[in-house]
Regions:
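A mobile, often basic/glycine-rich helix-loop segment
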Residues: 145-161
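Short, flexible loop segments at boundaries between secondary-structure elements
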Residues: 161-174
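ATP-dependent adenylation/nucleotidyltransferase module used to activate substrates
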Residues: 1-146, 171
Length: 174
């Protein structure tokens, strides 16, 4: 059983120190509406007022439905501004450009979405002098469930050592 109060305080202080030492003005994170993004958003907001979540749907009907609704609810509940950027046209452009050399090989396109999201987050972060927060948990890292140079790319990850069970435990506490 975690000491959730201590875990939250320690992680929030770590983020504050990171912002101070890097000189960044705030934090941006990809908000899919899931548990990991929710916890990252809340902890980031507890550390600084300058936090932005970016909702980045890309082709999937789920991205435009329940996931999007959850992402918006989290932003509203915790006063975290959300920006929505539909990456579908960008992915379609990639397919058009690459179709002659790759064809319609699904696996070749499988990791484009997380890499487009990473590029979007870093472009926004650069423009606004922000750090990109990672949203992957320890369970995902242990299983290799992330995309190299996609959702595995970030400036810091405040939940990388937490299991799914621990994330739910902290979310219930908050």
């Amino acid at each position: 059983m975690l000491n959730c109060k201590q875990e939250v305080e320690t992680r929030v202080e770590w983020i504050k120190n990171l912002l101070k030492t890097t000189g960044a003005k705030g934090i941006v994170y990809g908000n899919s509406g899931g548990k990991d993004c929710t916890l990252v958003g809340i902890l980031s907001k507890m550390a600084t007022d300058n936090v932005t979540g970016i909702i980045m749907p890309c082709e999937s009907s789920r991205n435009f439905g329940i996931d999007r609704e959850h992402a918006i609810l989290v932003g509203e509940k915790y006063d975290i501004p959300q920006i929505e950027i539909d990456l579908t046209p960008v992915k379609q452009a990639f397919r058009n450009v690459l179709s002659d050399s790759i064809g319609d090989c699904a696996m070749a396109y499988a990791n484009i979405n997380p890499r487009l999201r990473m590029t979007t987050l870093y472009a926004y972060a650069y423009k606004n002098n922000l750090l990109v927060a990672g949203t992957g948990n320890r369970s995902e890292a242990m299983m290799g469930y992330f995309t190299k140079w996609g959702d595995g790319a970030y400036d810091f990850n405040v939940i990388s050592d937490l299991t799914v069970r621990e994330i739910y435990e902290i979310l219930r506490y908050l």
